[in-house]
Amino acid sequence: HGMSEKLRLDVFRIVQEQMSNIIKHAKANRVKIGLSQNKVDILLSVADNGIGFDVTKNAEGIGILNIKSRAAFYNGNADFVSKPGKGCVLTVSFPNEYSI
């Protein structure tokens, strides 16, 4: 099964938003993007080796809120794991029911 047209666009927009965040804030020189699908979920990950941030203090920026709202539209989840000096990993999961 593939992803629906709308979900493909929203996955693209999430990657675009996170890349914008990385370019503006992370000072990263490497980004790894992964997309996989299993019987339960569609999983997207975007990891960078940038300066990181404190997710308890910086989790309400407009970019992060946009990513979380796009995931929530599909009953999905967006999770940011980061610490200052340790880069950032964004993991987004969508229920596989949105594939076609």
What spans do the regions from the language model cover?
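Coiled-coil dimerization/phosphotransfer module
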Residues: 1-100
